[in-house]
Amino acid sequence: MKTLSSLLLVLAVNVLLIQASPDPDNRCPARKYWNERKQACVCKRENRCYPIGAIFDPESCTFSMCQSKGCSAKQIFNKDKCACECRNDQPKDGCGAGRYWCNQDCSCKCSTPMSAGGCSGSQIWCEKSCACVCPNADKCTAPQVWNKDTCCCGCPVNMQEPADGCTKPLIWDKVDCRCECPLKKDCGKNRDWSDSSCSCECKGDGKCQGSKIWCKNNCRCICPTAEPAGGCSAPLKWDDDKCSCACPAKMEEKKEKCVESGKIWNPNTCECGCAQLNCPDNKKANKETCQCECKEVKKCNGGQVFCKDSCSCVCPGGDKDKTCTAPQVYDGVACSCSCPVNMQKPADGCPRPQKWDKEECRCECPVKHDCKNGKVWDETICQCICPRDAPVCTAGKERCGESCECKCINREPKEGCAKPLVWNENTCKCVCPADKQMSPGGCGSGKSFNKLTCQCECDQSASKCGLKRWNADTCKCECQPGMPPEGCGKQTWISDKCKCECSPTITCQAPQILDLNTCECKCPVNMLAQKEKCKSPRQWTDSKCLCECSTTPATCEGKQTWCGEACQCICPGGDKNCGNKKFFDKPSCECKCKNNPTCTSPQVWDADDCECKCPKDKQKPQGGCDGGQKWNDRVCSCGCPVPRPDCTNGQIYNINTCACGCGIDKPSCPKQQIYNWKTCDCECPNGMKEPVGGCGAKTWLDDECQCDCVPGKPKGGCTGAQKWCDKTCKCKCEKEMPTGGCENNKKWCDETCDCVCPQKNTCIAPKVWDAKTCSCICVNPPKCNSPQVLKDTCCCGCQNVKSCKAPQKFIENICDCACPNKKQCKAPLVWSDEFCDCVCPNSASMKTCLSPKEWNKVTCTCDCNPPKPDCCPGTQKWMDDKCKCGCPNAQTDCAGGKKFNDFTCSCGCPSGKLDCTGNTKWSAETCTCGCGDVNRNCGNLKNFNDNLCQCECKNKQEMANCKSPRTWNYDTCKCVCKNADDSDDCVKPQIWLDDQCKCGCPASAQMTCPANKRFIEKSCSCECKSPMPSPIPQGKKWNEDKCVVECANVKTCEGPQRWCDNQCKCICPQVNTKCSDKQKFIESKCECGCETQTQCKDGFRWSNLECGCLCDDKKCPGKQVFDKNTCQCKCPNQKPGDTCGNGKDFCPLDCSCKCKNPKPANGCTGVQEWNEEKCQCECPKDKPKKQCPGGQDWNNHQCQCGCPTPAPTCSNNQKYSNVSCSCGCNPGKPKNGCPGNQIWCDNTCRCVCPKNMEKPADNCKTKWWNDEMCQCVCKPGCPEGGCKGVMKWNANTCSCECPADKAKPASCGDKKSWNDDSCSCQCKSKMPCGGCPPNQQWNEKDCECKCSATGNCPAGQTWNSQTCQCSCPATGKCTGAQVWCSKACKCVCPAQKKCDSPKTWDENSCSCQCPKNMRPPTGGCNAGRTWDDATCSEKCAATPKCDSPKVFDPTTCGCKCGNKPNKLDAGRTWDEQKCKMTCDLPAIPCCHYEGQVYDSNTCKCGCPKEETCKQGFSFSPKSGCKCILECNKKDPGCGAKKIWCQETCKCECASEPPRMGCGPNRYWDKEDCACQCLKTKVCTDSDFSFFSHDTCDCECSNAKDFILNCNQKLNKVSCQPQCIQRPPPEGCAEKFGEFFSWDPKACECKCIEQKTTVKGRVFDKATCNFKCTNEPKTNPKCANTAESWDSQICACKVCSTCKH
């Protein structure tokens, strides 16, 4: 039931999914269905079966017996007409004027082709517009516009080159359509380019500061005196501001530091001077610090540090710090105690759980325990284990780790064995007691002894009894009750079913069935009803239960069929009335002609009308015969009447029109000429004939029907300023020479059409040539102020330059000598024009100051330098004569070892009073600590210590080196072992080692063990690290030397097999033994192959993968198809005896019938084409016979309609139309249509205005009538488009008006008035003539001068509206150490100090601070780190001691590998714990090639060693790592994926098999050199199913089309998404609530929001249920404690079952 309900549920979900999703079949028409993989409608399978010879049409999914033919790409085959038709329909409105529809190309074509001379100029022929057009797009960059005649861009009419050319030196630019400079230069930083003069002009105003003068040539201020010729002496550099040699500006800071440090600054060398230093050989003098420093600062290794005194690397500490305990030795590089080289820690570390003992320099167990219960201690694993030589436990038992005894693996159950079983310790099972055991065969037949129940039981079970009952005594199935006493009657007793039934031997033939009551065969009840309806001539048959004819059905003739109702042969439609000419033939059931005569060709017999008629392809045209031709029924064609007329005037007789004509349909005349059908020649139209008086200066061109200049305008145009005159066909000047001749000695030039200078002189820069005055002039010369004058350099300068005496300089502004930088001097200093500086007034009589005082140029007095401090240190006083602080009573000698103290100015101990150690005391007289009266006799081994006032051992070095496990004996002054009493406990071969204070092996027994062994201290010998396993696998043995289990017998392998040490046998290397279904694995070849190979038939090939012959698809010629059964090409649906019919033969290559009589050699007549189907000439399909328009007739040879000849004569204003075959307007409607809004009128043959746009009765009033536009317009001469200012033209009012966004306001205010030209309010008063005051600008809005800048002043400053500037107050408030600076108008530090990097100066605190990005973190430093304020960074709180090769890492404050390389080798990774490189992939157990082994260093397989081979042999790693014969063969060409291996002398795969094999269900194919699937599948479950060679399974091609959520997965059978979790069996509503429903997209039960409303309730989506709208939000919800809230009635009610 569960299975049925789940199936019904799935069916219901699928129905919902089908209903929810749109029906894909609705997208497709009948006979088709939607294919998801192809994303298109395809034919259904039931519509794909068709009869032999039929043609299937995939568009309509139908079949036709018509043989399709090859149509062009634009055509499609019509099976109804059995012919090609256009895919696109002919345009409804036709192809347009001058174009016709072409059925062969399925497109519109031009009626008149391109003229013989082609298109003019750069134009090309356009098939769409049937006219000559430009090939390139009309995209021109402004201001150029497009020219349709020349097909190129050019300047517009209003932007043409001036008639007299551009004013020099400007030239015309054809791209920008304007006059520009011929070449624009880069003027540099001091000049700007001028587009008016085409030259560079100076930027500045010509004013210079200081002693510099302005130079017009260089456009900059320069020094009056130049830099010395040889330059300044190094390191001095020329100072362009001071105009003299001086130290570079960057050395000013260096100079200040030099002066502050007390050194001497040399202005000539720009360096600080030091006193002479005498440095050793390994040191050099530092001029900056004036000290001796090491010449080379070495980078020390390990723990060494660099000593600046000795200039070498040394270990820190004294000799005591360099003493190590055995066996450690002191490392002079690492500066620490470490193990010797032969006792280093293993590279792979100690075997676990052993740990490395740094002091003992060996691997030891961390703790050693005493073993109990028969266990022994294992030094390798550091545990107590059971003895390894203990015997193996019997089956079902294992050795217990606690007692080392064999105990049962399965313990006795806690509740004991099930009764009557008891526990047996030997067998470890619950067994029957001995008194209840039964011997074999003791239970009798049919029974056996059950060891679980300890009793005899039946062998067979009661499950086989079915309807019978089981008898446990007899162990048999018995019927109960048995057969009835009265018997079964006609039925038989069935003992297996224990009931009476009909005998199974009785069988009834269909359709009869067995009657269970009578056990007889009878017809079914539903078929007996037909027996009553059975009437004559049919009879009822009981055996068949049918009403049928008594006689068997006769074989009917022809199309007659047997009728079961009448029991005779009849025609399907009965007899027909065939008329007079036909009779009814019963065998064929058809009407046939009474007479069947033979028709004369080309007539054929018409079986329908029973008479001879013309064939369908030779029927009389619907519109009759063309021209004057008439129809002939006997020959079935149109022809001209006889006799034919004689033609004149060069005309010939036309058999198509049966009249005389020119003999051509489409004449080709020059562009302007027309064809004269009377004279059969081309001629110019009447309005374009050659003038009677000739063309004058021009020549008549007959092809163009016009007069033109020959030769025409020159290709390059007219020279100079001349222009082409079309009337005279010559170039000439528009401007004539002046009547009075040229001025300023100029001459007239016909080329330029202007007066020019006779010669142009070369001007010296910066002067330029002036073409007006024909002389050199300055461009924009400056106005020079007195006493300066204008020079030839076009600059203002002095006439005479004086030579001034230093330090005065020549000032060019005043043209005289003066001081360049005169300034105001502070008292008592005064200004001196002689020195150009502030000097003392008595500088001439300056006094000579006594040393150490110096002359002060500021105070003009002798002062101390440095000056007197505020206070002297200690008790010192200021000595003005010496200019320093000192003691006036200074002494040189003091009594009792005392020294004079300059700070206190008195005698005293040099070090002051010291804290004495030990028993010593301080003496103020001797200034030392002493012992006083103490016994100083200490013996030979000891000395007296004056510091401690006691005796101590002499050998202090030995005492300092005495470390654990030794101790120092102060009485004997010796280092002795703490455990010296343990020397008697040593067991041989160990002895007491006094240097190590323990029992150990003697030196003679010490040895270095191999890598696979370790040294055992107890036995003083080497033993294997890994113990011998027990038991040893079969076929292997233990090697004590190598400490490994190895193969007992190593064999030599044959073929591709190689020896594997793991399995001790020859195996195939890295080969998957799982082969495909039809292949078997061949051990000798190590590959999958076939057991036997047979010879394949022609066309078939042998497949090693399928182990059989396969047929490959081939491309057959022509229309032949490939037959996989015979593997041959043959024609489809061809049967023996097939014929093509009359007039055709079968062609096996094309599989089609071809005409016996080929196409005529000269082709078909006229425009007719050959029809391969009918084997005759006929009109092409694009020119089928049609109903001709107007009076035209059909021409069968030309396959087109034409007018009858001769044509009628038209009136003067009309002409004959070849389309309507009638007279019409001459000339007709203009080609470009009527101008403006006019329309064409056929009655008057001219363009007229429409009725709704006729001229008004008032004659447009003030406007003029435009006949072309059919509307009233403004009178000409009005300024349309030429309004002043921003005003625009209004076509309605015919006047200039202001735009809507600039309408005139009601008022402009007091200061402004309205201006019509600008359409805006303008100021009444203008800006003052002299301009606005400084810093002010004219404000157009307020009509007055205002400050140009805003009044936002910096903090502390105020705004002055008169001067438009910010001003600073005299005083201000500052915080901290800052003071107020009125010049800078801010608080500043009184002094600034240079900070040591990385600290910077902080203006707020006036001190050096760490930068903001280098401050201590807010949360404090990380664990193990502290803040260093000197470096503004974190540092490690402690430096750990790292074991080599690890080193200290300051970033993590821990240890890291110091030997880690920057780049790892390929295929390797870094082990941070072991500090070495390891392989990134697991080791290869068995290498691919024989003899190779896996190398953990290279992570690859390779030969253990390489041999040197003799001549003629070479070493081969791929052939057993041995010498083999050299290969003499050459590369035969191995093909794709393979290369020639000279080493193995054969083709091998270019790529090796994957390192770890191909993986499951895949194997390595040596032929394809790739991993292949073991089995392939045919994936046809879905249209999207395909077999993937990557996964070796069926996959879906539409997997990317679905975006699956977490609850969905893709079903690979249907290739459709399905839910991972199925809907609950009981349904969503039953499980979660009545409003829950299954969502197939989300694959979960979702709440369905209810839109229906319930009175007093609202739907709550959170609970997915209706809740009461009046439910209280308080708790408790009911005020009365005796009541509770009832959500069913939405009210409080008394609760009868609640306890309150």
Swiss-Prot record:
GO cellular component, one term: extracellular region
Record keyword RNA-binding present: no
Pfam family membership, one: CXCXC
Domain of life: Eukaryota
Subcellular location: Secreted
Signal peptide: 1-20
Alphabetical UniProt keywords: Repeat, Secreted, Signal
Membrane-spanning intervals of the chain: none
Tissues and organs where the protein is expressed, per its UniProt entry: Salivary gland.
Record comment regarding domains: Has 82 approximate repeats of Cys-x-Cys-x-cys.
Summary of the function given for this chain in its UniProt record: Used by the larvae to construct a supramolecular structure, the larval tube. Balbiani ring protein 3 could play a role as a transport protein that binds to other proteins intracellularly and in the gland lumen in order to prevent these from forming water-insoluble fibers too early.
Protein name according to UniProt: Balbiani ring protein 3
Organism expressing this protein natively: Chironomus tentans
